[in-house]
UniProtKB/Swiss-Prot annotation:
Its main location: other. It comes from Homo sapiens (Human). The keyword Phosphoprotein applies. This is Immunity-related GTPase family Q protein. Belongs to the TRAFAC class dynamin-like GTPase superfamily. IRG family. One of its GO terms (biological process) is protein quality control for misfolded or incompletely synthesized proteins. Autophagy receptor that specifically promotes clearance of misfolded MHC class I molecules by targeting them to the lysosome for degradation. Acts as a molecular adapter that specifically recognizes and binds (1) misfolded MHC class I molecules following their ubiquitination, as well as (2) autophagy-related proteins, promoting the recruitment of misfolded MHC class I molecules to autophagy machinery for degradation. GO terms for molecular function: protein-macromolecule adaptor activity. Induction: Not induced by interferons. Disulfide bonds join C152-C158. Interacts (via LIR motif 1) with GABARAPL2. Interacts (via LIR motif 2) with MAP1LC3B/LC3B. Residues 334-393 are annotated as: Disordered. The LIR motifs (LC3-interacting region) are required for the interaction with ATG8 family proteins GABARAPL2 and MAP1LC3B/LC3B. InterPro entries: G_IRG_dom, IRGQ.
Length: 623
């Protein structure tokens, strides 16, 4: 088995406003995930990172305000993005020049890019000559220069962009044979991230720094999902209900019908994007919708005021690949959820509950259940689809039977052509009524219809709308709880300072517990929203929740204190990975170690799961 190849990072450095983000987006595939700096910290001095392909990551950092030197030293390839003579400030800032010279001295490949803008006074040839002279005067004449024409990233067949892409891939292929992999079965923190943690501990902002690193590690391996919500009205209402937002909340979709496809990333998992897509009145999607990015969505929710018609279904077909999930929400609330999505159970074609399917039968039953949900009977709410499902949709084809002979003779002579076949007509996609309590059946159907990686991303991105969804999401969060627990110990042990371990434990756990509380729909605003929707008395749902909130530093310290006896065990557990950091582990820096942090997380998650189940339980019928 050949050893794993290394991972290469190309860092794009330059002043803000030169189109670095657009350039990286043009070089990358749309299905990869970007790790952005945390919201509210635009000048955090930490690069964003995006995967351009197997083993190649493209980073971006604006200098100023960030200092380029430390990050340039970490890069395997350095790309300078330079302004034109019309730009404000110096064409090449001293700090950028020094970082580039140091990179050349280390033997780091150096590239330079000049982005032409619409209205620039220089031609491409003039810009090339002017930029080459600038590089020569700074001692950087060895850099490969690329001059990109205006709107190069948004047009196909840009020759200079393809040259740049080929140069990056060529450098990456050469370096991957020499560099170690950035990830090989475990999460690794780079020196720059550890330095940022230590700096934040000394100057403030430790919780924000750790939360950003944690969310970045979580999202690095998370699937991208583009989910379209298309219709002529009320698409914003459906998006906000799925995201658990009120109109006017940050990130909420407006009530007005969009004029073009508009993205709304999930607040906790921005790799899951809900798109509001307007539909035209001529029987097809509007030109803007059909030509927007992405060209095809991973799944689509059609929003109609009543029962969908054949024309409604035909309008959205161009926005989807043939096998992509398609479903409808009718906003009048009429009809029932499809029968195959009953709460807590799903029947396989033979009527056996999944709970009775042992061993490998569970996967087979789930697969058959998915087929039944997509091709099975649609009762009330299915409307006027392209065909009728159910018993009327079955056509009996009677095979030829040979006469004479006994049962054994007929059995021996039986062939596939002689059997009786049942042909199912293609059923319309399922239709879910919009109810005040949310769309739990729709969310469950989407998770079953999507590929596993995207289904998992959707599960973590949306707040649960039913007790079973809360249990499923809590189980997924529990399976990933080792990441934040290990991260606190890694950060503290790799940069041992007195008190840093305890500070990392408290800051990271506080941020993680607060995120889980939001993700499970236990914030006061979420509870009040559900109370209003269901017509419950104010405070009724809050009384069912017992996990203390908001998550305070004192609460986290108290929970960690209860685990104080686990500190030694936590340090021993970290000893298995002692080659990654100085001896002593988290215990040497005052932290409680992996086991304690993990125990606090799991205990709190169990409490929050119980609260979410209680809050989402169906209201008792009025007497």
């Amino acid at each position: 088995m050949p050893p794993p190849q290394g991972d290469v990072t190309a860092l794009f450095l330059g002043p803000p406003g030169l189109g670095k983000s657009a350039l990286i987006a043009a070089l990358c595939d749309k299905d990869v995930e970007t790790l952005e700096a945390p919201e509210g910290r635009p000048d955090s001095g930490v690069p964003s990172l995006r995967a351009a392909g197997p083993g190649l990551f493209l980073g971006e950092l604006s200098c100023p305000p960030a200092a380029p030197g430390p990050w340039a030293a970490e890069a395997n390839v350095l790309v300078l993005v330079l302004p034109g003579p019309e730009g404000n400030g110096e064409p090449l800032a001293p700090a950028l020049g020094e970082a580039a010279l140091a990179a050349l001295a280390r033997g780091t490949p150096l590239l330079a890019v000049r982005n032409l803008r619409p209205g620039d006074s220089q031609t491409a040839a003039q810009a090339r000559d002017q930029t080459a002279a600038l590089l020569n005067s700074a001692g950087l004449g060895a850099a490969d220069l690329f001059v990109l024409p205006a709107n190069c990233g948004s047009s196909d067949g840009c020759e200079e962009l393809e040259r740049l892409r080929a140069a990056l891939q060529s450098q990456a292929e050469a370096l991957r044979r020499l560099l170690p992999p950035a990830q090989d079965g475990f999460e690794v923190l780079g020196a720059a991230e550890l330095e940022a943690v230590r700096e934040a501990f000394e100057t403030g902002g430790l919780e924000a720094a750790l939360s950003w690193v944690r969310s970045g590690l979580e999202r690095l391996g998370s699937a991208r999902l583009d989910l379209a919500v298309a219709g002529k009205a009320d698409v914003g209402l459906v998006v906000d209900m799925l995201l658990g937002l009120d109109p006017g909340d940050p990130g909420a979709a407006p009530a007005s019908v969009p004029t073009a496809p508009t993205p709304f990333p999930a607040p906790e998992r921005p790799n899951v994007v809900l798109w509001t897509v307007p539909l035209g009145h001529t029987g097809t999607a509007t030109t803007a919708a059909a030509a927007s990015h992405p060209t095809h969505y991973d799944a689509l929710i059609l929003v109609t005021p009543g029962a969908p018609t054949e024309k409604d279904w035909a309008q959205v077909q161009a926005l989807l690949l043939p096998d992509a999930p398609l479903v409808c929400v009718r906003t009048d609330g009429e009809g029932e959820d499809p029968e195959c999505l009953g709460e807590g159970k799903m029947e396989n074609p033979k009527g056996e509950s999944l709970k009775n399917a042992g061993g490998g039968g569970l996967e087979n039953a789930l697969s058959k259940g998915r087929e039944k949900c997509s091709a099975g009977s649609q009762k009330a709410g299915s409307g006027e689809g392209p065909g009728k499902a159910g018993s009327e949709g079955l056509q009996q084809v009677v095979g030829m039977k040979k006469s004479g002979g006994g049962d054994s003779e007929r059995a021996a002579a039986l062939s596939p052509e002689d059997e009786t076949w049942e042909v199912l007509e293609e059923a319309p996609p399922p239709v879910f009524p919009l109810r005040p309590g949310g769309l739990p059946g729709l969310c469950e159907w989407l998770r079953r219809a999507l590929p596993p990686a995207q289904a998992g991303a959707l599960l973590l991105a949306l707040p649960p709308a039913s007790p079973s969804a809360a249990r499923t999401k809590a189980a997924a969060l529990r399976a990933g709880a080792w990441r934040p627990a290990l991260l606190a110990s890694l950060a503290a042990a790799a940069a041992p300072l007195p008190g840093l371990g305890w500070a990392c434990d408290v800051a990271l756990l506080r941020g993680q517990l607060a995120e889980w509380r939001r993700g499970l729909g236990l914030e006061p605003t979420a509870l009040a929203r559900r109370e209003r929707a269901l017509g419950l008395a104010s405070g009724e749902l809050a009384a069912r929740a017992h996990f203390p909130g908001p998550v305070t530093r004192a609460e986290v310290e108290a929970r960690l204190g209860a685990w104080a006896g686990e500190g030694t065990a936590g340090g021993a557990a970290l000893g298995a990975l002692s080659f990654l950091w100085p001896a002593g582990g988290a215990a040497a820096t005052g932290g409680l170690g992996y086991r304690a942090a993990h125990g606090v997380l799991l205990q709190a998650l169990d409490e929050m799961r119980a609260d979410a189940e209680a809050v989402l339980a169906p209201p008792e019928p009025a007497q």
